[in-house]
Amino acid sequence: MSGTFSRCMCTPAARVFWNAGQVFCTRCLSARPLLSPELQDTDLGVVGLFYKPKDKIHWKVPIGIPQVECTPSGCCWLSAVFPLARMTSGNHNFLQRLVKVADVLYRDGCLAPRHLRELQVYERGCSWYPITGPVPGMGLFANSMHVSDQPFPGATHVLTNSPLPQRACRQPFCPFEEAHSDVYRWKKFVIFTDSSPNGRFRMMWTPESDDSAALEVLPPELERQVEILTRSFPAHHPINLADWELTESPENGFSFGTSHSCGHIVQNPNVFDGKCWLTCFLGQSAEVCYHEEHLANALGYQTKWGVHGKYLQRRLQVRGMRAVVDPDGPIHVEALSCSQSWVRHLTLNNDVTPGFVRLTSIRIVSNTEPTAFRIFRFGAHKWYGAAGKRARAKRATKSGKDSALAPKIAPPVPTCGITTYSPPTDGSCGWHVLAAIVNRMINGDFTSPLPQYNRPEDDWASDYDLAQAIQCLQLPATVVRNRACPNAKYLIKLNGVHWEVEVRSGMAPRSLSRECVVGVCSEGCVAPPYPADGLPKRALEALASAYRLPSDCVSSGIADFLADPPPQEFWTLDKMLTSPSPERSGFSSLYKLLLEVVPQKCGATEGAFVYAVERMLKDCPSPEQAMALLAKIKVPSSKAPSVSLDECFPAGVPADFEPAFQERPRSPGAAVALCSPDAKGFEGTASEEAQESGHKAVHAVPLAEGPNNEQVQVVAGEQLELGGCGLAIGSAQSSSDSKRENMHNSREDEPLDLSHPAPAATTTLVGEQTPDNPGSDASALPIAVRGFVPTGPILRHVEHCGTESGDSSSPLDLSFAQTLDQPLDLSLAAWPVKATASDPGWVRGRCEPVFLKPRKAFSDGDSALQFGELSESSSVIEFDQTKDTLVADAPVDLTTSNEALSAVDPSEFVELRRPRHSAQALIDRGGPLADVHAKIKNRVYEQCLQACEPGSRATPATREWLDKMWDRVDMKTWRCTSQFQAGRILASLKFLPDMIQDTPPPVPRKNRASDNAGLKQLVARWDKKLSVTPPPKSAGLVLDQTVPPPTDIQQEDATPSDGLSHASDFSSRVSTSWSWKGLMLSGTRLAGSAGQRLMTWVFLKFTPISQLLYSHFSRRGALWLQAIGCLQVLFYLLSCSVVLTQYSDAFPYWVSFLVLCGVFVWVFLVLGWLLLYFYSRLHPTQSVLLVTTIRRNVMLSFWLLSSANFGNLCAALWLAPQVSYVSSLASYSVGHVISGMLSYVYACLQIWPFLLFMWCPKGVVTSVGESV
């Protein structure tokens, strides 16, 4: 700009202003030259070189060189004179306005919000805007300490009269309290310092820019304070260090900055915990507060600065609350150092927190409560929780997330090679990843040394679980979400549903904060070098000991192990797999091989095998001895029929249940108990203690000494020791055999009472001395009686039905759970699958009941009291800490007196003996036919579950009903005299729909006709009239009773794998006569069986409508209908193709029309069958009633159609020699269409009740049903 002259000719007393680094006069707008040396005022610094006031002014300017950041240094407010005057004036009063603005600012020597109000800046059309991009036109740029007419590094807001696209700040807003600062350059930062009017020295830092190199260097006396400032506080915050308690070492302090996890602020867990936002939920229950705290941590919203303002507002809205501005409110909102800070704090203290400024007070009210107060908005860029003042327990976990403006220049990520490791896909991939990281840091091997552990489908390691474990192990790893920390050496990524890890080979490890581990740190974060002793010495062993726990408990298990590690002089299984030793590689390879082979051959779970190896290696003094012991484990032969886990382990080392006591009871009557922690004494030495935090511990307790060596394994957790009582298992010798015989005979001759309730609060083990060992007195009967009061954990019965061994299809021998004529064997083998959390009656993702597939590994996380292998209809007791409390758990000694048995009713615990050849007995006993009967039981449970409402399948009443239904089905096989009869009796299950109708489930499946009683009676009458089933033939049964086949013949074809009702007669009818009649009879039967199999193979395996026909007709009827239908379709298509293509001109149009109508008839018939099929699938319970009513009418119409068409075909073939070929085809087609139309009309008349059931409303159904 320029005035009348090129140089100012005004008096030196005329005020000046700065614009773009140049000095101009406020009177003439010309450039002001330097004053003569005798007129210059040194107290005014750079301003004194151009301005000589008439009177002495009360403010001074520090010496400095004018730069872009502050023009001039210490008097940046002089650069605001021109833009303020230009934006608030017109063309005719600009000079007068310029003089007015200069007078106001020169009066105090600074720019403050009061000066803007005095100059009526806001009334004249100016507003503050946050800087989000280039600003056109005139503007005044500012931050919390500095203003300029040009953009500068660290500028956060701009004052302009131009309408910018972003939203203007609400009035009265001003980014600074006083714009009056000195500007220096230090390392990569720009430092602002000033002294406020009350004498408080403030400092602020911003990132450097390209123009920062020309700044004045920071004085040496301020370097220590600036180092504390840049490490402990975020950018653009004017800080007075006197308000804070500081420490010399930054490693143990707290930092508000986004680039450093630690700082010089003294860390107080009761002050800097980031949880002050929970004061908004003080009016709620403690459970709500704990839930909100856990949710913020688990979802990653909790940071060291608190939580996001929008998240806090949303959580209040979810809880039905909101915050309103109330001057008398109990909650006070504060900001860090200035009101524009994004770091907020909520406090209940009336005194202002040092280092913070008070903004307002709020009150939490209900959403539905009318109020006159203004709603408080927490803000989209604010974080609440900086310095909580409420005294709370120390938080073990702190998380962080970056929300501040990151420095523009971030340290580059070093270029290095990347190696990826993909762990085994066994469900524990997340923990294998951590094991691979630790193994590489210790042994240099980037693989997981942990054996595979098959986890349940609903138990997986989340990113929150991995972050917790990484912090416990202090690993230099991060969980990659949208971005990765540049300082992390190991990057853990989720590839679909599988965790993988990458390592940066050429990069040095660094200690990572919570923000870096979670992956929400800033781009320019700085991490200290990784210390030499950063990794715990036994980190790998701690991870190996805890990774089999539930995923949400692994980090707690690692922390418990590191806090109280076991002694190192013994070589346990975990130590052998993880610790460096010459035998580690060979031990690990041999152990993984045995883990894959031995449990499958023995029919045991992987968990049982792992526990057995742990017991074998207990107190092992050296790795050589551990390797020698492992090498003694025998691999069972594939030809062996059945091998127990005990036979695979060396003699003298019981596989399953070596006692955890150092001294066994010397007398069989001695009681062994696991007492509560406050008990002063007990017999024997206590076994392993139950781990804290819900971790399961395995206790092995022998029932008694002797050849039988009856033992029990108890998997118990912290839940079993509530109320100061533990699990007590007593072992005692019976005083006489008559007591056991009376107990056995008391229920032996009674019929099975299906209505007898199972004991819900008593767990009892009953054994009996076998005739094979009459001299043994070791079969004592321990009984643990549990008492409950209705105030704490509940007992839930989770049904485990049906088992299959590892790779063979024959189930295991489970007869011990049902009969009392064999020794009590409580070994853990092939433990059945536990129900999932979503639906305890089904396996997730499949349409199979839970008894189909056994879990391949023993889950340490199952909160169940497991007593070895149970029967298919047995249940596992689970403890839930919600309603009942365990108050008594004392052993009952059966050897003392008869009164001891009076407290326990033997009829409640002794299972009824089933006949030898019943289906359940065959399943329990095992053998070649056990798999067949297990599949039949599978079908029974599946059909029964289909009749239940899906949401009720997990209820105890439904499970009890399922067991009773199976018992009723099993009763039909109680009169069998051969092991082959039960399969044929139960193969078809034709009686099961009627049985379900007679005894419906507690909550039947809902359908359209379920609420109409009149319609139910109508359907019942139709079903009674039309469904007359012929009695089953008993020829096969008589033959089986008279000539029983040898038991060693394998019955592979007793029941087909596809669930059909036919059975092979070849292997079940072996005749001892080798005469020619017998040979002829056998050959005839063999030929018939072969033909039958061929028809089945052709029409039931390779036709899409096979299951459709079979679901509604008998097997023979379905085969004949398919054969005739296929031939009819082929002939008809042949005739249609000939008539429509070659001889279309020889026939009138009505013949072609009838031919096309015949095609549509077949299409409609097929669609009707498909409709019936899908409806029966969607409504199985209702379909049982509908099929009986409809299928005979439909079959009659189908036979009518086929017979008429067959007659037409015969007539056409008979007339073919007498008439032309074309005439015969035409007559056949016309006859086919006419008969098809009649049959189709008849079929529709018969199917209309089916359509009525599906589509008509209930009222129409009632009226029409009554009329019919």
Curated annotation (Swiss-Prot):
Sites marked Cleavage: 180-181, 385-386
Broad class of enzyme this protein falls into: hydrolase
Protein location: Membrane
Gene null: resulting phenotype: Knockout mutants display reduced infectivity.
Membrane topology value: Multi-pass membrane protein
Peptidase C32 domain: residues covered: 269-385
Database matches in Gene3D superfamilies: 3.90.70.160, 4.10.80.390, Arterivirus nps1beta, nuclease domain, Arterivirus papain-like cysteine protease beta domain, Porcine arterivirus-type cysteine proteinase alpha domain
EC number annotated for this UniProt entry: 3.4.22.-
Residues annotated as domain Peptidase C33: 420-527
MF (Gene Ontology): ATP binding; cysteine-type endopeptidase activity; helicase activity; zinc ion binding
Chain residue ranges for the region called PCP1-alpha: 69-182
Source organism per UniProt: Porcine reproductive and respiratory syndrome virus (isolate Pig/United States/SD 01-08/2001) (PRRSV)
Residue intervals of every C4-type zinc finger in the record: 8-28
Function: Nsp1-beta transactivates the programmed ribosomal frameshifting event leading to the expression of the 1aTF polyprotein.
Chief localization: membrane
Residue ranges with Basic and acidic residues bias: 737-749
GO CC terms, sorted: host cell endoplasmic reticulum membrane; host cell nucleus; membrane
Any single biological process term in GO: viral translational frameshifting
Full protein name: Truncated polyprotein 1aTF
One Pfam family of this chain: NSP2_assoc
Coiled coil segments of this chain: none
Lineage, top ranks: Viruses, Riboviria, Orthornavirae, Pisuviricota, Pisoniviricetes
